[in-house]
A protein has these predicted regions:
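Flexible coil/turn and secondary-structure edge motifs
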Residues: 17-217
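Bacterial N-terminal signal peptides
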Residues: 5-15
Length: 217
């Protein structure tokens, strides 16, 4: 990733989302088993910067059964984390959410998505810079696209953010699950420097914004 300023160089050396694969593999663990899912689950795909944080935020929502970190939006088939981290594949770090629409609506997922990151910074989230960290929503149906467009229009009209929303809205082509060491990385590595400096503050802020719509902890 490209560093934002010389003042951040030392800090980002230890707190970048793009750490070495070897370091992450050492912390890999199996995703926990959730309660049996109903047959009528729907799926939604979002990109909001480093997927370690995005995954953790989504998993806290009531009605969400599974969240898978992965890559989408680009042209490279079966990309690796190292390839996506170059910013040359066109893929974004994303999450694929399986949810019960009887419990949590697509609009609530949109609300959570915009609460979990800054949708006004182009190709950047916090210290992470590059197209792989862009804000994006990948729709599956014309109805979803219309809902996304209307929601963004509403947020811009209400000036919910200090700058216009730059979130990409695109049709989902193919989602590639990330390597196992990236799944539930936040929960397995609470003392990781990046988690403590970047992800945990974002998740705590998200929890306050989405109070009443989260699972019991």
């Amino acid at each position: 990733m490209r560093l934002l300023s010389f003042a951040f160089i030392f800090l980002l050396t230890f707190t970048s989302c793009a750490q070495s694969r070897k370091e992450k593999q050492a912390a890999a663990q199996t995703k926990p088993t959730s309660a049996p899912a109903p047959d009528s689950l729907a799926v939604a795909t979002f990109a909001g910067g480093c997927f370690w944080c995005t995954e953790e935020a989504a998993e806290k929502l009531k009605g969400v059964y599974t969240v898978v970190s992965g890559y989408t939006g680009g042209s490279t088939k079966n990309p690796t984390y190292e390839q996506v981290s170059t910013g040359l594949t066109g893929h974004a770090e994303a999450v694929q959410i399986s949810y019960d629409p009887k419990v949590v609506s697509y609009e609530t997922l949109l609300e959570a998505f915009f609460a979990a990151h800054d949708p006004t910074t182009l190709n950047r989230q916090g210290p992470d810079e590059g197209t792989q960290y862009r804000s994006a929503i990948f729709y599956r149906t014309p109805q979803e696209k219309a809902q996304i467009d209307a929601y963004i229009k509403k947020l811009n009209a209400a000036r919910a953010f200090q700058a216009p929303i730059v979130t990409e809205v695109a049709a989902l082509k193919e989602f590639y699950p990330a390597e196992e060491e990236h799944q539930d990385f936040y929960r397995h590595n609470p003392n990781n420097p990046y988690m403590r400096a970047v992800s945990t503050p974002k998740v705590e802020k998200f929890k306050k914004k989405m109070e009443g719509k989260l699972k019991d902890e």
